[in-house]
Each structure stands twice: as structure tokens, then as C-alpha cells.
Amino acid sequence: TDEVAFDAFEAFSNAYDKLGNLRPTIEPKATEHIPGMISLIQELIDTGHAYESGGDVYFGVRSFAEYGKLSRHSVDDLRAGDRVEPGDLKRDPLDFALWKAAKPGEPQWDSPWGPGRPGWHIECSAMATEYLGPGFDIHAGGSDLIFPHHENEIAQSEAPHGETFARYWMHNGMLNLSGEKMAKSTGHVVTLLGALERWDPLAGRLFYLRTHYRKPLEFSTDALDDAEASLARLRAFRRRMPEVVEDASDADALDAFKAAMDNDLDVAGALGVVFDV
């Protein structure tokens, strides 16, 4: 599993660099933060929001009155089986795992509840809290993670002390191929590194930016070709920037550009202003 994780991280990092993105200040690894996860789980047990059952530990969803506020789900409307983990050890079908008892062939760590591994929601809360504190400004992620992952993050992070976990949530739309979400597990995917071998990396960035981040994005060779043509136009615009800046009549364009960027980071709208100048 370490080898698989390393290979995936290397591929991600290489693509990140080719796109010209700045590296994150911290890139924490879940397996290096197990003690922090155990500590948070114990705090949830101590405050009455979690319970041990057969070596597993579950978060009691109904113990957190605000559960569902991000996804706008009502607890009473949620059904077992609707993206909810099944399990006979739960007090309530909606409860989710914070710690799972060890199974043969799976990674495991020692804990007060016996050997096992953390649930996939608690990892993010523990690492975010360690590096950003109990409350921070912006949490981003794919729109497919709103429920249950981000909803569960909020619950397990806010339940012990009541402080807001993240003040702003930015959820990006899915990247689709032939109308379906890309998924490596099914082979329905075009890798970013593969695409960057064919197209200018800056065209790749422009391809992403020309659609508002909350909307789904359709991958196609035509779309990337068009992004390269648009990139050429932007480079031409950059070359004539001095004369554009000297033209006072473009003050309205600058205001429109700023207004678009201030409107939920509407880069696509801001680029439209640039292309109209």
C-alpha cells in the first residue's frame, strides 16, 4: 500500500509542477497522523458523541444537532443505504465509523479499542486541526464529497467544542469524459500527465479556468485545442499590455474583471472580459 500511495503522490506532484502550480506548504500523510486521529476519537467518546462497539468506534449522528447543514439533508429524511455505511454494530444506521477493528490483510495500528485503522472521515479532521487549528477559512474539495464525507468532517470536528470547522466551502464540479465522471477504478479516465504530453501545460490550466469551478467540465480534444488557441490570444494580449494600460477607456474593463473575480472566483467571467478588450 505504501508503494501504491508513493506512486500516486509522485504522479500527482509531477502533474502539479508541469501545470506551474505552487506546491502546498504542508502535504501531510494520513499514516503519519494516527495518534492525532486516536486522540480526536477519544475526545468524541468522552463528550458523548461517539461509542465503541465490537472493536469499532462510531460517531452518533443524532448527537450532533446540526448534522446535515452543509448538504442540506435532514437526519430524519436520510435512509440507510443512501451513501450510508451498513453495519450491525451501530446504534443507528446513520452512524459512521471513526475506527474500524483490524481485519486480515489490512493495515492496522494499536488503539485503546484494539488494533485497527481509522475511518476515512476522521483523517481529514485530525490533520486539518493539527495544522490549521480548530477553525479555519477555506475548505475545498470535489462536489461528490459534500455528502457524506464533508458533512461527517463537520460533525466530528465541531461536536466536541462547537467552533465552526471551516468558514467557507468551495466544491469543484466533476471532470467528465463522454458525459460520465472520470474514474480510474473503471478505466474511464485520461491522465493529466498524458494530456500534458500533447498540449501546452498553460493551455491545460486555461481549460480548467474557462469553466466556473463549481460546474462540471467536459474533457475533449477539441476543448483542449480551443484552449491552446485561446492561450495564444492571451499571450498576444500580454504583449500589448502597455498600450492597454495607458488607455483610460479600459478602466471599465478592469472593474468588470475585478467584479467577476469577486463573484465566487468567477475566473471564466474574468477571462471573458480580457478577451473583449
Enumerate the predicted regions with their spans:
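The substrate-binding groove and active-site-proximal loops of carbohydrate-active enzymes
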Residues: 1-2, 25-31, 142-143
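Alpha-helical recognition segments enriched in aromatics with Gly/Pro capping
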Residues: 35-242
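Short secondary-structure capping/junction motifs at helix and strand boundaries
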Residues: 13-28, 47-56
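Helix-loop elements that line ligand-binding/catalytic pockets
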Residues: 216-219, 223-277
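Hydrophobic face of alpha-helices
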Residues: 2-5, 9, 125, 254, ...
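Hydrophobic/basic alpha-helical segments enriched in Actinobacteria
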Residues: 29, 48-52, 184, 194, ...
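N-terminal, positively charged nucleic-acid-binding surface of large information/translation enzymes
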Residues: 1-22, 40
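An acidic site on a long C-lobe helix of protein kinase domains
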Residues: 8, 32-36, 270
